[in-house]
């Protein structure tokens, strides 16, 4: 090591000698570089190279230059700028800056900047000057101004120089806010002056805008000022209410309530009080009020005036005009609301009164008023029986109920889609039956031809799971309107004269509306009583009609079964299930309702499901019960089982079972097809049109009729496909695909839906023509 040092000394001496000698004896730049490199390799020299590598400097000298830059920049130097100025790598500058900050407590390294105490003192002086001008300052403002961390400004500047360089104090509620005492005094003076000048409720925001004081300072100084008023809250919409105004408000409210025993919310709101109900409760803590929508009624007004008057009205069996005992400025709605509230509070028995247009009638008064109308209702019931109007109503109602029962039911898989299918549901047509005598030994003949033909095409839903085939056996049915024996005009004419004497004739119509249904029901009950007292021949006619109707449905069932047997086993099972749930359900309803009537059971519903029928059957006589229960169970079995169960029920009801007649069956099939064609010619809905066309073609090709819902259309088309030629099959397949696409669209307003509808309209005439004009002869020619 000593030899190396001796060599270095020798080289240094040679270097000095070379500098003192002439140019020819100086070291070259290369030699100088080699010497410095050798010193660095032997770690005998520590230097810092510039970024361009042309110069180098010792760390001590670089440290002095950094401090010089800090001084030259006023005590705050950005290390990035220092690196650019000194042309030294930033990492070297940062390392030396950390050492400078660690060695010198007067210098701070903060966010890549060197800051000395002189600069901190300087910004403290600036902050003090700004604070003296504004009176209040926050750390957030200083952070944005000086671009320094808030914590550094908080602890190293503000709190360190507070009370020394910075003349002010720190907010106790918010340590990041500083202000001067003079500023606080000015704010107090502004607030005190503004509040002293206010004589009516004023929004706090308006006050702050006028005096230019922050809201938080306003609320913090408000208690110290002790103003002659109060602030409603510390929310954005708070108001300052001076005591003098509150006193005036209270005096007005007390005076009005003392004179009238009620208070209007609108009048209180006009005084500047937003929550009238809360103010009333606060102003009258010991008073009981009935709070309505527009007014608050005092308890003594209710107890001493309204309740006592109502009790007197009930006791005297008269009526009461509430408008005459309540304040005149209450509207009719207010009076009605007050009456409802009194009834709700159980001050009086609600069932004893009827309210009509501010007039309260006691039930006893109305009962006496309507009493003559009961005699009129009985007279009208007798007149309906004598004229046959009630008997006609009973027949029409029975046929309508049967028609509803024989309408095709929805398939079990489509229960969730009832709404869409109901929109397209049509009423089925009913068959007309002839009369006959009751008894097993007497055969009954039909007096008219069976007019049947099932509207066997029906509702298609959006998933192409369409339901359902409508069945008809005669002219189309319409829903029967309830029989109106007692009309509103009859009641009005009967009570109007009595009301005119009291000056209440304008209430004749509302009163009649209250009792017309009751009187009509009484008249219908009387008519039913008279009807049941008529000769037994009426019962025999009903027996014959039910017998004819059930036999007609059984014939339909057998004819539909023939068509079902043409399909494969799986499809047969589905079609049989659907047939029994629709047509079989109608037969069960017919017989169950007939037996219920024979057993004197009252049945309000006519379209019963299995559970409802079973519940009703349990109440019937024992002689019918087992047969009816077996019939209901047979709905889930085969058609043969159901027919046997139905025949057993017919025998228990003393009804005759007709034998099959092939000639009549052929006529019925032709009639059914004609009905379908008539519906097809009138149909405009593509899905229903395709359904009808498929059923007509099936009947034409097979000679059998079919009871199938819309979801079986594709199965029917597949079954008749071999009988049709290629063009006919292509037409039906194309129309079927377009129908499916239209149902899947879901909306009729889109361009795609309009385009599909146009295509369907184009093909509609061809489909109708194919269904109406197709025959077996044409099939043979095509083949």
From Swiss-Prot:
Task: Share an example GO biological-process annotation for this protein.
Answer: response to endoplasmic reticulum stress
MF annotations from Gene Ontology: UFM1 ligase activity
Q: Does the keyword Transferase apply?
A: yes
Annotated region described as Disordered, given as residue ranges:
404-482
- Which InterPro entries would you find in this protein's record? Ufl1, Ufl1-like_C, Ufl1_dom, Ufl1_N
One of the record's GO cellular component terms: endoplasmic reticulum membrane
Q: What is the official name of this protein in its record? A: E3 UFM1-protein ligase 1 homolog
EC nos: 2.3.2.-
| Species for this entry | Drosophila mojavensis
Name the family: Belongs to the UFL1 family.
Task: Output the PANTHER family linked to this UniProt entry.
Answer: E3 UFM1-PROTEIN LIGASE 1
Q: Which UniProt keywords apply?
A: Transferase, Ubl conjugation pathway
Q: What class of enzyme is it?
A: transferase
- Stated role: E3 UFM1-protein ligase that mediates ufmylation of target proteins.
Q: Spans of biased composition, class Basic residues?
A: 445-457
